[in-house]
C-alpha cells in the first residue's frame, strides 16, 4: 500500500466523514457507538480500498460498509431483530394519497421532524436518510442497502407517509 | 382525487424521471392544483427532513482520530516499505560478508596447505612421511588413534600411474588431519583430509598459486589435493578418493 494510494483514499473518504457520522448516529442512536462505527468503517474501507473498483460509486460503497458494520454490531443485531414489521408485500401502487397538508408541514419544527424520523423502523429510516438527507438517487440507495430499486421506492413512500402522519397527528393534537 | 399523475409526483420531486417524463409532469402540474399541492408538500417535507436529519456532525476529536488512523497506516506502510528494503539490503550485505569471509578463510586454508606441501617437498623423504608404505592397508591403520575420524584410501593397482608413498599427521587450524603423499611420474601429490561439515560439496579447482589445488567435501570430511602435476591427473586421483569415501 503506497502513499499515493492512501492519499487517494483520504481525498475520497474524508469529505464523507460528517454524512457517515450523521448516518451512524441515526442508526445507532448513540454518539459513542457512532464514533466507533465511523472509525471502524474508515479502517475497513482503507483495507478494502484495493478491491474497490474505480468507476463504481464510492459514497454508496462507504455507506454500505458503515451499515454492514452497524448490522453486525450488538445494537444493530438487536434493532434488526425487533424491526421486521409489516414491510413485506408493500407496494407503492396501493399507497393512499391523502389530502396535502402543506400548511401543517410548514408548522413542523425541526424537533418534531427529528422525532418523526426517530420513530421510523430502521428499514424505512435508512431509506429516508439516504434519499432525503444524503440526496442519493434511488439507484445509489439500492446499491448501498443491497435491495431492488422497487423496494427503495416503496420503503421511501412509506417512510414519508409515516413521518407526515406523525407530524399531522402531533400538530393536530396540539391545536 | 387520485389523479393518474399522483404516483409520479415523488419521482418528479426526487429527480428520478427522464427528461420527457419530467416535462410531461411539469406541464400537468400547471393544470392540476391537486398534484401541485402534493408536490409542494413533498418538497416541503423533503426540506424539513433534510434540515432535521442533518443533525449530527463529526466531533473534532473523531476527525482527528480518523486522520490519525489513516496516517498511522500510511506511516506503517512507509515504515514497512523502507524497513523491508533496509532489511533486504542488510541481508544482502551480510550474505556478501559471509561469502567473502568464507572465501577468505578458504583462501587462507589453501595457502597454508600449499605451504605445507612445498615444505614437505623440500624435506628429506624421512621427514616427508611418518608411515612409509605403498600399501593402503598399512598406511590407513597407522592413523588409528591419531585422528578423531576415519577415511578410506583408494586401491592403487599395479598398472596405475599413481603410487602411494605414505602419510603423516598434519594440522590445520589446530585440527589434526591426515596428510597422504602420492607420486605420479616424479610429481608428488599431497592429499590432506580434515574433519568438515556434513554433506558434500563439488570439486573446486584452484590454480591461484601455480600449484593445482582441488578440494571438496564428502561424508563430513574435507579433502584437499595439492600438486604441481597437471590437473587431469589431479582429477583422476580426486575421483578415486571420492569413490573410496562414498
PLM region spans:
Chain A
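Helix-turn-helix DNA-binding module
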Residues: 118, 122-126, 131-151, 165
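Sigma70-family region 2
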Residues: 2, 40-57, 76-78
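A short, charge-rich alpha-helical start-of-domain segment used by transcription regulators
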Residues: 1-22, 32-35, 46
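Short, aromatic/basic-enriched loop-to-helix "N-cap" motif that marks the start
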Residues: 18, 50-64, 149
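Internal acidic/polar
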Residues: 80-106, 137
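C-terminal edge and immediately downstream basic/flexible tail or linker adjoining helix-turn-helix-like DNA-binding
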Residues: 2-9, 82, 106, 139, ...
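Structural recognition of an alpha-helix C-terminal capping motif at a helix-to-coil junction
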Residues: 36-43, 56-68
Amino acid at each position: 500500500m503506497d502513499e499515493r494510494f492512501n492519499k487517494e483514499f483520504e481525498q475520497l473518504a474524508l469529505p464523507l466523514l460528517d454524512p457517515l457520522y450523521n448516518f451512524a448516529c441515526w442508526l445507532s442512536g448513540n454518539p459513542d457507538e457512532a464514533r466507533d462505527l465511523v472509525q471502524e468503517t474508515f479502517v475497513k474501507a482503507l483495507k478494502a480500498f484495493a478491491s474497490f473498483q474505480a468507476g463504481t460509486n464510492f459514497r454508496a460503497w462507504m455507506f454500505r460498509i458503515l451499515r454492514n458494520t452497524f448490522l453486525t454490531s450488538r445494537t444493530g443485531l438487536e434493532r434488526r431483530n425487533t424491526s421486521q414489521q409489516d414491510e413485506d408485500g408493500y407496494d407503492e401502487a396501493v399507497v393512499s394519497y391523502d389530502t396535502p397538508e402543506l400548511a401543517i408541514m410548514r408548522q413542523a419544527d425541526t424537533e418534531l421532524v427529528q422525532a418523526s424520523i426517530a420513530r421510523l423502523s430502521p428499514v424505512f429510516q435508512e431509506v429516508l436518510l439516504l434519499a432525503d438527507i444524503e440526496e442519493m438517487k434511488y439507484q445509489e440507495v439500492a446499491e448501498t442497502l443491497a435491495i431492488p430499486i422497487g423496494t427503495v421506492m416503496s420503503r421511501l413512500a412509506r417512510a414519508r407517509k409515516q413521518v407526515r402522519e406523525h407530524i399531522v397527528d402531533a400538530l393536530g393534537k396540539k391545536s | 382525487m387520485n389523479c393518474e399523475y399522483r404516483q409520479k409526483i415523488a419521482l418528479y420531486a426526487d429527480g428520478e424521471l427522464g427528461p420527457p417524463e419530467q416535462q410531461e409532469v411539469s406541464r400537468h402540474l400547471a393544470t392540476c392544483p391537486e398534484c401541485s399541492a402534493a408536490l409542494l408538500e413533498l418538497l416541503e417535507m423533503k426540506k424539513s427532513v433534510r434540515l432535521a436529519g442533518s443533525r449530527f456532525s463529526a466531533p473534532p476529536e473523531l476527525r482527528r482520530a480518523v486522520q490519525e488512523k489513516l496516517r498511522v497506516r500510511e506511516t506503517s506502510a512507509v515504515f514497512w516499505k523502507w524497513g523491508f528494503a533496509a532489511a533486504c539490503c542488510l541481508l544482502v550485505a551480510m550474505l556478501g560478508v559471509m561469502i567473502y569471509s568464507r572465501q577468505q578463510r578458504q583462501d587462507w586454508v589453501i595457502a597454508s596447505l600449499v605451504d605445507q606441501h612445498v615444505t614437505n617437498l623440500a624435506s628429506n623423504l624421512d621427514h616427508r612421511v611418518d608411515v612409509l608404505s605403498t600399501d593402503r592397508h598399512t598406511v590407513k591403520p597407522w592413523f588409528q588413534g591419531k585422528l578423531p575420524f576415519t577415511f578410506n584410501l583408494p586401491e592403487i593397482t599395479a598398472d596405475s600411474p599413481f603410487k602411494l608413498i605414505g602419510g603423516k599427521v598434519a594440522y590445520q587450524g589446530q585440527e589434526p588431519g591426515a596428510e597422504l603423499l602420492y607420486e605420479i611420474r616424479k610429481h608428488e601429490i599431497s592429499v590432506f583430509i580434515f574433519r568438515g561439515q556434513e554433506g558434500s560439496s563439488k570439486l573446486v579447482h584452484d590454480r591461484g598459486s601455480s600449484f593445482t589445488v582441488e578440494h571438496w567435501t564428502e561424508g563430513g570430511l574435507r579433502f584437499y589435493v595439492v600438486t604441481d602435476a597437471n590437473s587431469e591427473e589431479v582429477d583422476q586421483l580426486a575421483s578415486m578418493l571420492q569413490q573410496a569415501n562414498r
